[in-house]
């Protein structure tokens, strides 16, 4: 509608009755903060993509850093750098792009300067320090191991302060002090982003700290998995989708010089996304130990998401009606068209992948990686590039240095995306088919996991070419931005604008009468017509506090309906009598597993599928994970599943040698050497506080509460003796192997999956009355595996 064109809102649709309604006020915009975020976006975008390129090389060349000192090499491993790449891409590149868009558009849509210049600067520098902290801690192995929420609790606290206090407070106070009566659609999406990310961040990161660099989640196992993917899915929704839709609704009409196609469609688009998106997270956990009702719920809402998502894409593309001739000559519009197209592709593929039968094939494969990158590179990346090219001449008050170079960036970037995602789609589908393939006798056609890895290597090499082209495009952007900046004036012009102060007294225009009124139709039809006209929504748009509360209510209500049953209904996590908490040494080994990022390559979740149970063993049960903080189910299998690794009875010496040189036992392995684990000495003194924290969270420890260190040392001696007896060394790197960090990790790996087949502890016999004669009780038969497990799930093909 034309009243929403180019970010301008109507001011004459209602009458103002206050005597001060014509009071004019002068103001200027704070474009300095936008320049800062824009420069940071380009810089971090280059760093994030170069890091991704390095990670891609490390996957196919695991020995790339072997020449370095082992401790340095450990910080540059694939498993340590992959979370760094994802965090840099999302929160550094994507985050700074969001902030640049919000600070630029909000001031113009509200006809006022940001409420506080100081909060804006605190926000900028605080966010950059958070990114630097992530860049330091993640390679050091300081991580929570939750996707998109890897950062430890001190950084999480800083994020909460910077996001809600500096950014959210500044934004909401700007809305409160605006000089434009109605809030434009872009502002709605910004509100939803700020509110929902706050809720997600706080409740997913509730932990018990045991030090500055380590904490345990208050959630365990299945509940932790549900909370993580409630957060993980909606982090994509409300950090990588809604703010970029706000960006689209402001900058696309500006660039096209056309009004937004449909105001009504934008209303439907917004509220549908806000309400439906929050329910969809459990579709990431199909066929896992999560109760089936929860994952089915997630699937249904994911499928429903397709319609409002495409409503937004259509609204964006049809905004270009009458302006398609400009697309051929304007690189900004080219970026927006392709970005919106990738948004449409991703929001179709997402619901598709949520369907259980398709997810059974795609989950844990590179198909998910291709899906994520088509959205990140195509939607988020190209929408950001379009915004940057549009802003550069306006912020630096000079002509864009090279329009031709921007064109080259577009074409090279587009080709790069295609060369990246197509091979990875092929790799993912190939992996899924090979893992499930059975011969005529019902046996695995590819019994060795390494066969699927070797088939993927050519595709992994091909995606490096695509990634290189994408990085080359960002280098072109950086050059163009730098040269444009060098052509800036010696002093920026800062125009002063005037606008009337908003009156505190306001009378809405009456809602127009339905054209069906007075016609021979039911009263219900007249009321429905008035509702569908959506004039009522115009009233909501002038109340930022009410609008924010309604958005918050929609998000919280949807979340509670999903989360509360999982925590209150005990049958969701049936008890397994034989499951016991980890020993002190195993608990330390589990923390090493988390620190090394093993979850990036290995899952610990065997799905109830014939091919998986033949390959890995008995499928996983919800009750097995009640002491797992955080859960380690993983989302990708570059290596085999480890949920039953302890049941395989692999020797401890095999694991020791495998950590030192993985390819010695598995030819063609892409696992790097973990020699540093053999060289490092385990800090036994720190184990006690880990046990104390686990006990505080419910682990039923007894003498471990006072003897954790000595118990860990005794168990380490047992494993060391076993390794030595099997031909291993007595000492390594100047210390006895019983003191090695690798011993703790081996203890943990050897424990995995064994509880399900253990004999459950028996209750002590009740005391007999003193006067009763002593009688001999015959021995009872040991509990079988079936007795120990109190839950069943049908196995599916």
What role is predicted for each listed range?
Residues 1-31:
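Short, Lys/Arg-rich, polar N-terminal cytosolic tail immediately upstream
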Residues 527-582, 713-722, 748-777, 787, ...:
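Post-cleavage N-terminal segment of exported redox proteins
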Residues 551-556, 614-741, 796:
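Electron-transfer interface patches adjacent to heme c in soluble/periplasmic c-type cytochromes
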Residues 585, 594-600, 605, 638-641, ...:
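Short pre-active-site segment immediately N-terminal to redox-active cysteine/selenocysteine motifs
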């Amino acid at each position: 509608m034309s009243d929403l064109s180019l970010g301008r809102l109507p001011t004459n649709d209602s009458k103002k009755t206050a005597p001060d309604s014509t009071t004019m006020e002068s103001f200027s915009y704070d474009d300095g903060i936008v320049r800062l975020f824009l420069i940071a976006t380009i810089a971090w975008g280059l760093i994030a993509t170069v890091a991704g390129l390095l990670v891609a090389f490390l996957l196919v060349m695991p020995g790339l850093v072997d020449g370095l000192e082992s401790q340095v090499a450990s910080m540059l491993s694939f498993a340590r750098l992959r979370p760094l790449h994802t965090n840099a891409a999302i929160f550094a590149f994507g985050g700074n792009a969001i902030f640049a868009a919000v600070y630029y558009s909000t001031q113009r849509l509200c006809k006022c300067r940001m409420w506080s210049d100081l909060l804006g600067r605190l926000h900028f520098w605080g966010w950059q320090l958070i990114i630097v902290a992530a860049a330091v801690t993640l390679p050091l192995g300081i991580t929570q191991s939750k996707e998109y929420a890897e950062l430890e609790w001190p950084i999480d606290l800083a994020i909460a302060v910077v996001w809600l206090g500096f950014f959210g407070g500044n934004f909401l106070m700007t809305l409160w002090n605006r000089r434009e009566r109605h809030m434009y659609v872009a502002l709605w999406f910004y509100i939803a982003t700020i509110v929902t990310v706050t809720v997600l961040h706080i409740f997913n990161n509730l932990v018990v700290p045991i030090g500055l660099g380590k904490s345990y989640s208050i959630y365990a196992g299945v509940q932790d998995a549900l909370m993580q993917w409630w957060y993980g899915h909606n982090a994509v929704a409300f950090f990588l989708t809604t703010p970029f839709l706000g960006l689209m609704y402001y900058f696309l009409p500006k660039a096209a010089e056309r009004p937004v196609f449909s105001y009504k469609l934008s209303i439907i688009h917004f509220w549908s996304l806000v309400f439906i998106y929050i329910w969809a997270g459990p579709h990431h956990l199909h066929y896992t130990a999560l109760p089936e009702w929860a994952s089915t719920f997630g699937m249904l809402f994911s499928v429903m998401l397709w319609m409002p998502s495409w409503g937004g894409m259509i609204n964006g593309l049809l905004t270009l009606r009458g302006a398609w001739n400009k697309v051929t000559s304007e690189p900004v519009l080219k970026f927006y068209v392709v970005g919106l197209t990738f948004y449409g592709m991703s929001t179709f593929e997402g619901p598709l992948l949520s369907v259980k039968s398709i997810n059974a094939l795609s989950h844990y494969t590179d198909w998910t990686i291709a899906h994520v990158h088509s959205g990140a590179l195509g939607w988020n990346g190209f929408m950001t590039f379009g915004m940057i090219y549009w802003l550069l001449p306006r912020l630096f008050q000079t002509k864009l240095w090279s329009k031709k170079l921007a064109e080259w960036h577009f074409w090279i970037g587009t080709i790069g995306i295609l060369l990246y995602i197509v091979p990875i789609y092929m790799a993912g589908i190939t992996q899924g088919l090979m893992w499930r393939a059975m011969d005529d006798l019902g046996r695995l056609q590819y019994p060795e996991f390494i066969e699927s890895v070797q088939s993927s290597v050519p595709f992994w090499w091909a995606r490096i070419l695509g990634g290189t082209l994408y990085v080359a495009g960002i280098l072109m952007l950086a050059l163009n931005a730098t040269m444009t900046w060098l052509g800036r004036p010696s002093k920026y012009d800062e125009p002063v604008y005037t606008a009337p102060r908003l009156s505190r007294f306001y009378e809405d225009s009456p809602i127009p009468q339905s054209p069906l009124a007075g016609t021979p139709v039911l009263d219900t039809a007249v009321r429905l017509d008035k509702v569908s006209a959506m004039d009522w929504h115009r009233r909501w748009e002038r109340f930022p506090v009410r609008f924010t509360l309604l958005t918050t209510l929609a998000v919280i209500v949807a979340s509670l309906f999903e989360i509360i049953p999982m925590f209150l209904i005990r049958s969701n996590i049936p008890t397994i009598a034989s499951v016991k908490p980890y020993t002190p040494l195993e608990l330390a080994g589990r923390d090493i597993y988390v620190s090394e990022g093993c979850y990036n390559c290995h899952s610990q979740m065997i799905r109830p599928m014939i091919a998986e149970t033949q390959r890995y063993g008995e499928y996983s049960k919800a009750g097995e994970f009640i002491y797992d903080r955080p859960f380690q189910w993983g989302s990708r299998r570059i290596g085999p599943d480890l949920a039953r690794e302890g049941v395989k009875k692999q020797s401890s010496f095999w694991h020791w040698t495998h950590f030192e040189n993985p390819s010695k036992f598995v030819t063609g392995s892409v696992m790097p050497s973990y020699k540093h684990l053999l060289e490092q000495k385990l800090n036994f003194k720190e184990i006690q506080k880990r046990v104390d924290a686990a006990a505080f969270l419910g682990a039923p420890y007894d003498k471990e509460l006072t003897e954790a260190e000595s118990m860990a040392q005794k168990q380490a001696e047992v494993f060391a003796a076993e390794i030595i007896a099997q031909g291993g060394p007595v000492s390594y790197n100047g210390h006895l192997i019983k003191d090695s960090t690798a011993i703790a990790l081996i203890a943990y790996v050897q424990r995995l999956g064994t509880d399900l087949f253990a004999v459950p502890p028996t209750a002590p016999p009740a005391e007999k009355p003193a006067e009763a004669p002593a009688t001999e009780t015959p021995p009872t038969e040991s509990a079988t595996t079936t007795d120990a497990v109190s839950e069943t799930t049908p196995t599916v093909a």
